[in-house]
Regions:
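Chalcogenol-based redox active-site neighborhoods
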Residues: 1-176
Length: 176
């Protein structure tokens, strides 16, 4: 693994590290391949005509990630030009089950199971502690050209993202 340890996250009163850092605002998002709930490999080009909110989480089975996915889905409902991408190491089956169980309307579950480079390329790979190998929670907002217009790294895995800031980056006001 190349690069530096940059970000720190908290879990159960201890601090752990991630590899690298989130892509910078104004930079082009790395185009990676992920697995959707139909077991197809997809890249960011799959949503080339849409603006994107990418929520990266530990697992849809973790309380904090589940809460964030559900809230993002509620806020994104009715926004036809936005793709809500939920990325984790969960199996595609878990993403599908979660989406059905919570009647998600917009969120698209994406798994990194076939493409290990995602965590490193996006600076979210946890490198030590009990969650090593999983993704640190983060939010990236991309325009239709995949330029990053907002980023947020959650320093505590139980924290919720700033939903208003994510949608505001796309010119959308939401009520929390």
């Amino acid at each position: 693994m190349s690069g530096t340890i940059v970000a720190k996250i908290r879990f159960e009163n201890a601090s752990y590290q991630t590899h690298g850092e989130l892509p910078r605002i104004g930079s082009h998002a790395p185009d990676v391949s992920l697995v959707n709930t139909r077991l197809h490999d997809v890249s960011l080009m799959h949503w080339s005509d849409k603006r994107k909110i990418m929520y990266i989480g530990i697992s849809v089975d973790s309380e904090a990630s589940a809460r964030a996915v559900i809230r993002f889905d509620e806020y994104a409902a009715g926004c036809d030009d936005i793709a809500l991408l939920i990325v984790s190491y969960d199996l595609p089956f878990a993403h599908k089950r979660f989406g059905q169980a919570h009647d998600l309307q917009v969120a698209e579950g994406l798994s990194a199971i076939r493409h290990a480079g995602f965590g490193e390329n996006y600076g979210v790979l946890i490198v030590d502690g009990p969650l090593a190998g999983m993704f640190s929670p983060a939010v990236l907002v991309l325009d239709e050209n995949n330029t990053i217009v907002h980023r947020e790294h959650l320093e505590d895995i139980t924290a919720e993202p700033d939903y208003k800031a994510a949608f505001r980056a796309l010119g959308i006001d939401i009520d929390e």
